């Protein structure tokens, strides 16, 4: 009898929940989706800020250093911050060059007879 009361309450709540109408999501687009141009502008700002936060890479030549190359312009934000945004070139190019320096060289293992698929003994 003590389990019957909670079960009836649960069924009563589920009945009310199932009585609510469910909108068909295929007919209407989501109301909070942003336009494409706003998303692309946001992605560009994120890339530029990521490049500014990257630490200097060890062993980089003086001419290739991002902090020494003045290939950008200053942008003032409402909070009083000042950041530098790159102009003229895609920030992905700089990021790929930085990541290529950090990448470890591929190290070949022993003869192929000792390896099965990608696991070597």
Curated annotation (Swiss-Prot):
Where does it live in the cell? Secreted
Give the PROSITE patterns listed for this entry.
UROTENSIN_II (PS00984)
Q: Share an example GO biological-process annotation for this protein.
A: blood vessel diameter maintenance
Q: Which cysteines are joined by disulfide bonds?
A: 115-120
**Which stretch is the leader sequence?**
1-19
Q: Which GO terms describe its molecular function?
A: hormone activity
Q: List the propeptide region positions.
A: 20-106
Q: What are the UniProt keywords, alphabetically?
A: Cleavage on pair of basic residues, Disulfide bond, Hormone, Secreted, Signal
Q: Which Pfam families match?
A: Urotensin_II
The answer to whether the entry has keyword Signal is yes
**Species in which this protein is naturally found:** Sus scrofa (Pig)
Q: Which GO terms describe its cellular component?
A: extracellular space
Give a short account of what the protein does: Highly potent vasoconstrictor.
Please report the name of this protein according to its UniProt entry.
Urotensin-2
Q: Which family does it belong to?
A: Belongs to the urotensin-2 family.
Check the record and name the InterPro entries matching this protein: Urotensin_II
